[in-house]
Swiss-Prot record:
Residue numbers of N6-acetyllysine PTMs: 406
GO cellular component: mitochondrion; peroxisome
Record function comment: Beta-oxidation of fatty acids. The highest activity concerns the C6 to C10 chain length substrate.
Residues annotated as catalytic: 327
Positions contributing to CoA binding: 406, 410-417
Superkingdom as given in the UniProt entry: Eukaryota
Subcellular location: Peroxisome
GO biological process, one term: generation of precursor metabolites and energy
Positions occupied by motif Microbody targeting signal: 610-612
Lineage summary: Eukaryota, Metazoa, Chordata, Craniata, Vertebrata
Protein name: Peroxisomal carnitine O-octanoyltransferase
Organism: Mus musculus (Mouse)
Pathway: Lipid metabolism; fatty acid beta-oxidation
Result for mutant: residue 553 to M: Loss of activity with octanoyl-CoA and myristoyl-CoA
Amino acid sequence: MENQLTKSVEERTFQYQDSLPSLPVPALEESLKKYLESVKPFANEDEYKKTEEIVQKFQEGAGKRLHQKLLERARGKRNWLEEWWLNVAYLDVRIPSQLNVNFVGPCPHFEHYWPAREGTQLERGSMMLWHNLNYWQLLRREKLPVHKSGNTPLDMNQFRMLFSTCKVPGITRDSIMNYFKTESEGHCPTHIAVLCRGRAFVFDVLHEGCLITPPELLRQLTYIHKKCSNEPVGPSIAALTSEERTRWAKAREYLISLDPENLTLLEKIQTSLFVYSIEDSSPHATPEEYSQVFEMLLGGDPSVRWGDKSYNLISFANGIFGCCCDHAPYDAMVMVNIAHYVDERVLETEGRWKGSEKVRDIPLPEELVFTVDEKILNDVSQAKAQHLKAASDLQIAASTFTSFGKKLTKEEALHPDTFIQLALQLAYYRLHGRPGCCYETAMTRYFYHGRTETVRSCTVEAVRWCQSMQDPSASLLERQQKMLEAFAKHNKMMKDCSHGKGFDRHLLGLLLIAKEEGLPVPELFEDPLFSRSGGGGNFVLSTSLVGYLRVQGVVVPMVHNGYGFFYHIRDDRFVVACSSWRSCPETDAEKLVQMIFHAFHDMIQLMNTAHL
């Protein structure tokens, strides 16, 4: 990835889009076989027998018919899932998306040239903006290298959704507005929006056809910051984006009915490249401990976040940065890519601007002054209170395991991602005394507009291994053998899922066909084992590998009694971030992370002692 980012290439970013294969529909029999295997850890014999009968009936009856209809749909679309997934996973969801759906992550610059330091916010911010805008230009010019797996190009469509993209709330379903264009496609917006102390501003990032420089960006930021510091706090319209979706949709309609100019102002935020947030708070952040950064990124002041924007770049008063992104238009790997690019530039320049200090005579930022009334101001304070109350329930444990990392697991011929997934299974098993149904993201970008598939990490093999680790009579060799079986199973599942042979999205497709056709919901989806094994968004462990770079992220748990678990892998360490809800008496993110680190040691020890 690193050299892919920086080498200059002839290939254009989006040149392979039209030649990517369509997303396949797996064989029904295969999907159902895999589904049955995945429910086994959560069933006793009688329950499993009953589910087996339900699956058999489905395969020969309703499932067969629905599968045929799904194949018909797939014949007419290059990606049969895309529109459905967007609607079901994101746009139809009514709970507040800023806290519950968005993903956040700190920028890793505090590990090197930019440790937390008061008084650095605006100057560092001007350089952050500059590097981000350079990335935007690379994308506009299609100079961003195509991601590949070996020599196979991967789908790059999600990168179109990074800039000038915004979700717009609807009464029953939201929509996504995307205004980005490459240079060859024509003009697109060239302004950014800045939120500070409840007020909103916009300014253009091009002057006479060139990007404005860090000294010029600093002048714009200083103007905004000074103005907001010396005058009363603004109406905080942005806080409405943290509301329940239908409430926000109604508040937005009302806001526009107050004054049509309000729509023009909303559209300036929607079309902006991204939103830059100037925060007054200073989260504690060291390379070893930065849980507070995550908590503030997800749960911080909603009046300086536009929750629906695909990219909020957030700056804190102590010069720490992070992002808060709407998950609907793209997956986290897009943000990982730009965050890594910016971090590399900060390293290269030692965090300083070494160019001209000249500031041209560029127009000052324009404030977006909304027409508001008592009702809107009440809606805003209700939204703020709702968001801050819900966010106070969130616990995030961000920790770094430094005893070893990828280098050692590779030496033992263990895949580092699988290593972490199995450690999580063992930790959950030890902490809760039962297996935990688990969702790990696999990417399906080999296919046209491919996004993700579910790897169900809690396998029969993983559970057998966990049991052997807790069984004092099991020998080291037996434990090691069971662990290696669990590794092999996980690696195969990950490969299958990435190549379009998962089953969760397939089952979702069959359910949605039934709904669209007005048919009864098949028994398979109403079977208690369907949800107990994670189906229908019920995974107690919602997890993802963030990558092999310095970038980290987190999302809230999928269910109230669950965990979100996100991690990245380096040669000498594993960096993890775990989320849980404080109001759930049985979960504790801190404890789970400690147990995972304990499991890392046990697993490596198992490999070492079993060699003897």
